[in-house]
Amino acid sequence: MKDGGESKEQQLTVALRIRPINETELAEGATIIAHKVDKQMVVLMDPMEDSDDILRANRSREKSYMFDVAFDYTATQDTVYRFTTKGLIEGVISGYNATVFAYGPTGCGKTYTMLGTDWEPGIYIRTLNDLFKAIEETSDDMEYEVLMSYMEIYNEMIRDLLNPSLGYLDLREDSKGVIQVAGITEVSTINAKEIMQLLMKGNRQRTQEPTAANKTSSRSHAILQVTVRQKSRVKNITQEVRVGRLFMIDLAGSERASQTQNRGLRMKEGAHINRSLLALGNCINALSERGSNKYVNYRDSKLTRLLKDSLGGNSRTVMIAHISPASTSFEESRNTLTYADRAKNIKTRVKRNLLNVSYHIAQYTSIISDLRKEIQRLKKKIDEQGLKQIRSEKSDIRNIQAEVQLHSSTYGRHEMEQLKEQLIRAFREQMDIRRQLMEIENSSMEMQMETSRHFLITAEWEQEKTRRARKWRDEHRKETYGKDDSEKDSDTGDDQSDFIEPPEVITARETIQILEGDQNKLRRQKLELEKRFRDVRHHARRLEEALPKRISSDDQREILSLLCKVHELEIENTEMQSHALLKDNMIRQKDYMVQRFEQHRSLCDEIIQQQRRIIYDHNLTVPHQLNDLYELYFRELEEGVLDKAAVLALKDSQSCLPKIPNLTAEENLQEPDSDQESVRTFGSDNRNPIHRDSYKNLLPQILSETDSDTNKVFKTSPRARHLKNGAVVTPPPIHVNGIISKEYLPRNQINYFPDSTDSKVVLTHREKKEITTSIQSIAVKAARRRSRVLEGDRLQPMKERSNLSVHSMSESEDTVFTDQRFPSSSLHHAASEDNLSSTTGEIVAVHGGGSNHRDSPNLWHRTQKKQAQKLEKREESLEVKRRKKRSRSFEVTGQGLVRPKNHISRNRALESNSDHKIQSNTLQTNRKIMLPIAQVKLPQNQTTTVFKMAEQQEGKHQTNQPGSVKKLISTNQPPRFNYINANASGIYVKDVRVRKY
């Protein structure tokens, strides 16, 4: 090594950088206490300043510090680099040593300053770029060799970041006092891209762990060493080699365990970090004392041993101190400023590193060959310059323009490719971040729904526990009531029994805690991604703004603008997907709410049916207001108001209504179907169990208000629906007293389930004949019933004209009453062949005593057979007489009564979804067709053919029932109209109301 001449004294350069305050510090209520006054002065405010302190009343608590350069939160990475490190590159190439290190507490931005990000590179990358640019500028006269090594000091152990498989390395010192790391990997490169790739590879191997103070805290000191060897291209017997070293160090931050909340390995790492930084601080204190020969202990730490030349030896050193402006970090900021202020007094002696190489005689031949190669290179260069001069003399303006255009197009194409790559990289990064945000949002929504579900479980348990506690207190109060004081004192120890939580509640609470922790993690990840996205978007916008300045061709501008538009469309597509995902989650939550409300509505239907059954079973008096509410309830069920919204909302989900229970043969005996066709044989529900199960489990179809029969609480049997829609043909309009009853369109035959067997019912010839015969007599019986209602109104006073049951209007020969209670059945249609043939004065007597008919089902079956035989004989005689005496003006085709088109029948008995049957004490007649009666308004003074025919039929078929009244209709009485409203649920006296107008 040759002496590089006299050494020059160099003062250590100290810069200060104040990072911006973060959201965590603002959330803690911190204020800004560090301020940059000018380019060199920084003021630190004391947040604990007390105006009431008498001893320090006139003393300022502010501390001001002067540095070589100061930066606040507005300074960019390029500004920090230009004022601190850029001036060291020329000295490194010339053979001088240089050192740049970042110092400060944890979480203050040291790694950001040294390493930076992809779109805001730090000092590492900027220094290496400028270093290779300087090498290229002087490569014509000088030869260069660049070596790079990258290491970290982790827990006082040195590890190679470029080759981690080497393990921990030793620190050695040679005879000349130069510190060397034994076995470190030195990579030789002359390309900036290669050295960048090596740098990124080493950064991925560096130890980083999150702490409470910093989520990406560096747990080691990283040291990047770049060695540059420079020698002349002109060979000689002796040659001079200049060796310059550049150290760039990212120190780990000093930390307090109370702030970082470290435990275990993290605390051990923090102890080693603080130990090495303390040794560095002691070295700074010893070196900063002027005029003292105090011993500087570099051997306390491996960090100070590596920085020996940088601090007190042959090096130009720059120290960049970092502090936080928050008041919560006042102590750490003050200590950092104190050490940085002392470091200004450190001076180093800088000299150039020169190596004199003397070649042996055996190497002379190689020197001669190298000199010849250099001569050839220089001649070739001279020839190229001569050709350029000749071309320039002979060329005209056109050739010059063509050459300029060629160079400009080549440069423009290269510039465009670079911009294109940068734009595409920025766009892809934005898309990746957006997709990650969308995935995090989706996961967060799913966790919220899962948390809500578990909260419902715990809330239900809390309500149940409160109910049990209240019940226990009531029972305890009843037990202790009446006891003497001694017994009460003995019972005070057992105040309330402990309720053990079910396993599902315990699991729900544990799951809620886990989900809340996961949600907090997702929230933090979302904040980080949003911050990254803002930075990337800002970088992309700057590139888009630079397009018009850096590109001159219109075609290239158009291509890049189209590229930007494509990216904008991709971003909009991603945003639409995100919005669709959010809406899907909202719809899922609403479906869950609708399902819960549907379950609640089903429970309310069950309660209503049970209450109504209890009222009818015990013959309780129903208030008028409650009866109106029942009518409104059943009307809404008929019209589908309550069910239509639920069907629309739950058409793609499973039905939450209670299932219809499976009935055995005995249960069918006790609760026959609401339609008379279903009572024909016992246990008819068990004929096709597959059909019944599918009928229960499948969801109802979406129908109109008039056709939605399956959505109602009560519904007709499949047999009755088939007979009503298939066998009965709509007759022509019937003129009654000038009032035309409009034709009622039959309901559409809709098969609700794919395995339904309703369409397979085949009627025999005898059944069709019986149906036709029974339907033809309905009009006559209806007219006869209305005439007797009018006669009853004439004879009875107003107060006795109470609501009459439709089922009380049955003839004595059709119904046999005994003291035995018949099996309860569901609600009947208001208009049937049985309840249309009675007189108006009949009232059904309900006997509470007697044996239960459920014990003797055979007796009930025999009674029905006898009744069926009587009905057949009576209908045959009635049909013969009716054909002889009826008027031709009232011609019925035998297809049944017509109904108004706009009439919605409320008089049909329906099967319940929530409650299987509503009990009734009325006996059903076998094998009859039941049709609802529309409201018919008839004047009492009209003696039409209908009433005459009814009177003739009355004379032939007298009844012996008590309460039937026979009286001629007066023809000179003023007209008076009666409206008979038959309710579908009206199986008792108070369900049919006769209103006079």
From Swiss-Prot:
Organism: Xenopus laevis
MF term (GO), any: microtubule binding
Region listing for Disordered, in residue ranges: 468-503, 662-690, 792-811, 848-890
Family annotation (CDD domains): KISc_KIP3_like
GO cellular component, one term: microtubule
Major subcellular location class: cytoplasm
Residue stretches making up the Kinesin motor domain: 11-346
Residue runs in coiled coils: 360-437, 508-577, 861-889
Extent of Basic and acidic residues compositional bias: 468-491, 792-802, 869-880
Binding residues annotated for ATP, in chain numbering: 104-111
Entry's localization field: Cytoplasm, Cytoskeleton; Cell projection, Cilium
PROSITE patterns referenced in this protein's UniProt entry, alphabetically: KINESIN_MOTOR_1, KINESIN_MOTOR_2
Keywords of the record: ATP-binding, Cell projection, Cilium, Coiled coil, Cytoplasm, Cytoskeleton, Microtubule, Motor protein, Nucleotide-binding
PANTHER family listed in its UniProt record: CENTROMERE PROTEIN E, KINESIN-LIKE PROTEIN KIF19
The keyword Repeat is annotated on this UniProt entry: no
InterPro entries in the record: Kinesin-like_fam, Kinesin_motor_CS, Kinesin_motor_dom, Kinesin_motor_dom_sf, P-loop_NTPase
Protein name: Kinesin-like protein KIF19
Source species, domain of life: Eukaryota
